[in-house]
Amino acid sequence: MSDSYLNFANSAFGAKLTNVMGLPKPLLLARYRTDQPVLSGSLLLGGAPGAQLLSPLANAFAAIGVQTVAHRALPQWVALANQQGLMTGRWGVEDQPGAKVKALLFDATGLTDSNQSEAIYQFFHDAARSVLAGGRVVVIGRPPESCSSPRQATVQRALEGLTRSLGKELKRAITSNLVYCAQGAEDQLESTLRFLLSPRSTYVSGQVIRIGQPVGAQAPIDWAKPLAGKRVLVTGASRGIGAAIAEVMARDGAQVICLDVPQAQPGLDEIAARLGGRALAMDISAPDAPALLTEAALADGGWDVLVHNAGITRD
């Protein structure tokens, strides 16, 4: 879906006119494309003393293909990254900041007391202004409820307020999110980092994501098609946001069941055919809807995902 004012304000003439008239100039936000890298630019890595995730992060970055640079407080990263064949180097010289980067990531798993928070302050004090527009900020800690002492739990809980504040202060379409990684789940970081560092997370900021130990599910073989083999029902799929959601699900490899009211049958059939999915015309508020939905789901062998798009009713 296009935004006429957004496109105009970011054109050569529109940018000049909006500047003269004092009108807002919204940024063009990145959109995910399968032919682009997860992160278009370098990632600056920092960590608290005793950071526990450097080896898992090196493995994840090698798999994702992220180019990293190390903050001066994390000199051990360069040797570790080189062992994984990562392109890396040191960021900045003494107190002078280095080149602009696309993402910041801080490993806060080593924080056990608020007295150690100087490390995370120093990292963002040095680097916050060096993040490019549309960049990413990720902080990784340990779940507070799993901490061994009240002091450790307190400093880990405080990370949530920090990431939310960063998201508000940095602006320029920069997102800021917190990841709590449980003990024993370190090798599960890749999928979360792929999401948070990529344009997939353009509208996700100030959130807390928890990574626990796996319960049997396997990571997708093809990261470009993470929903391959899944069946997804999307309501309100004939137009607007519902249609856009259905397109994303199909792009990610899912078989899409497009549902909308019978009055929207023409548009529903069109998008289902275009996406290689199936159209299901019914009113989910009707008395017989539960039985019809159950019958349709059983006929498909079950649905893996249901996206209920709450639209605006037109009287």
Feature map (PLM): residue ranges:
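Conserved glycine-rich cofactor-binding loop
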Residues: P49-G50, R231, S238-R239
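The beta1-alpha1 cofactor-binding region of Rossmann-like NAD(H)/NADP(H)-dependent oxidoreductases
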Residues: L280-L292
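Flexible cofactor-recognition loop at the NAD(P)H-binding site
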Residues: F106-L111, R142-P143, R239, V305-R314
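NAD(P)H-binding Rossmann-fold N-terminus in SDR/SDR-like oxidoreductases
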Residues: A51-P56, G240, A244, T313
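Glycine-rich phosphate-binding loop signature in dinucleotide/nucleotide-binding domains
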Residues: G98-A99, A296-G301
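Conserved glycine-rich Rossmann-like NAD(P)H-binding loop of the short-chain dehydrogenase/reductase
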Residues: G65-A79, A254-D269
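Hydrophobic Val/Ile/Leu positions in short beta-strands of Rossmann-like dinucleotide-binding domains
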Residues: L44-G47, V234, C258
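Glycine-rich nucleotide cofactor-binding loops and adjacent beta-alpha elements
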Residues: M1-P226
